């Protein structure tokens, strides 16, 4: 596979090399990236802002050169070349992975996806995905999405936890997809953001692929699609706001992009500027959070067979709850 090249932007200045690559190569796990670094498939060239020689020699025919270390600190203006092996086509099979199934019947299932789990197989993720877990735990799944996405009607980012509805047959899939398309499904998230955000704020900004970094989305892209996000509730904490966020559209990275665009990125979101900030007391839980503080907490849809409106709530997972519990003013908020 041809090498991918990334110029380190300002928001990643001072980051470890492996953490930077985890952020820009969203479809690859940290262990895969660390192996690529160890095998010499990653090169770092010192940027012009700091001067100095490249981190190592010119690219050779296969690996990019002598290995650098995963904990190498990169800086704004550095150039990182990555050569990842082409994905090997594999048959998708069920795997005995833990899966929190909140509800299921003959038509649908509702699951609580953990953070760190990719929804479906793709480049660098032939196993360990939600689809692999679904194939093990459920006997029937729709085939509309193709062999790699059975049952999948909508998605969550790898780093986002929370609720997803899964279709068990094609008729249910088509009806649920229609509801998402016609904006009849209600989706609400809980996110912790930097700064003070007021309830009632509406963010109406089209989203498209970022021209400078193809792994990112942008609210300033040339070819963009409508996207609307609303802050429905907000609880202020020192330097932070815990928000309840509703989305009317379902664009890739929508909440993360929109909140970053208004200057209030999600805590822990390295890709969109949510790291390297400090709060009162230098809260360690915030500093060590390695994924965006974003959780799909509420899902409301119409049952595809009998027309019932079905509402599901998923409480914050333990890693996010621990962050809240360590924040000044949270435990004594009442």
Question: Where is each model-derived feature located?
Answer:
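Short beta-strand micro-motifs in enzyme catalytic cores
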Residues: 109, 241-243, 297
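RNA pseudouridine synthases
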Residues: 1-211, 293, 313-330
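Pseudouridine synthases involved in rRNA/tRNA modification
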Residues: 1-35, 212, 216, 222-225, ...
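Short beta-strand segments enriched for Tyr within beta-sheet-rich domains
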Residues: 176, 251-259
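A short beta-turn/loop motif at secondary-structure boundaries
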Residues: 155-158, 223, 235-237
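Short histidine-centered loop motifs in beta-beta connectors
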Residues: 67-68, 243-246
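Oxyanion-binding "anion nests"
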Residues: 226-231
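A generic structural motif
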Residues: 45, 234, 246, 302-304
């Amino acid at each position: 596979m041809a090498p991918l090249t990334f110029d380190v932007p300002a928001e990643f200045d001072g980051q470890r090399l492996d953490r930077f690559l985890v952020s820009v190569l969203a479809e690859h796990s940290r262990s895969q990236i660390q192996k690529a670094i160890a095998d010499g498939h990653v090169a770092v060239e010192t940027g012009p802002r700091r001067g100095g020689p490249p981190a190592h020699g010119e690219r050779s025919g296969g690996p990019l050169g002598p290995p650098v270390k995963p904990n190498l600190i990169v800086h704004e203006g550095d150039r990182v070349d990555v050569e990842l092996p082409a994905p090997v086509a594999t048959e998708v099979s069920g795997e005995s992975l833990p899966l929190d199934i909140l509800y299921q019947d003959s038509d649908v299932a509702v699951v609580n996806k953990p953070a760190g789990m990719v929804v479906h197989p793709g480049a660098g993720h032939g196993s360990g995905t939600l689809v692999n877990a679904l194939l093990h735990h459920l006997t029937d799944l729709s085939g509309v999405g193709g062999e790699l996405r059975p049952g999948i009607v909508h998605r969550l980012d790898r780093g986002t936890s929370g609720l997803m509805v899964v279709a068990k047959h094609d008729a249910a899939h088509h009806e649920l997809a229609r509801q998402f398309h016609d904006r009849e499904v209600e989706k609400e998230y809980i996110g912790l953001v930097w700064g003070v955000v007021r309830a009632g704020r509406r963010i109406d900004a089209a989203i498209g692929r970022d021209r400078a970094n193809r792994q990112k989305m942008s609210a300033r892209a040339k070819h963009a699609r409508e996207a609307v996000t609303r802050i429905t509730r907000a609880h202020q904490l020192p330097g932070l706001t815990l928000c309840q966020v509703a989305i009317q559209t379902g664009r890739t990275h929508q909440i993360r992009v929109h909140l970053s665009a208004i200057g209030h990125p999600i805590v822990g979101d390295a890709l969109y500027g949510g790291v390297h900030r400090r709060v009162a007391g230098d809260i360690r839980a915030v500093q060590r959070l390695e994924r965006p503080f974003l959780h799909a907490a509420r899902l409301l849809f119409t049952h595809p067979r009998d027309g019932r409106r079905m509402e599901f709530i998923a409480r914050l997972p333990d890693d996010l709850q621990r962050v809240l519990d360590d924040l000044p003013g949270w435990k004594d908020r009442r």
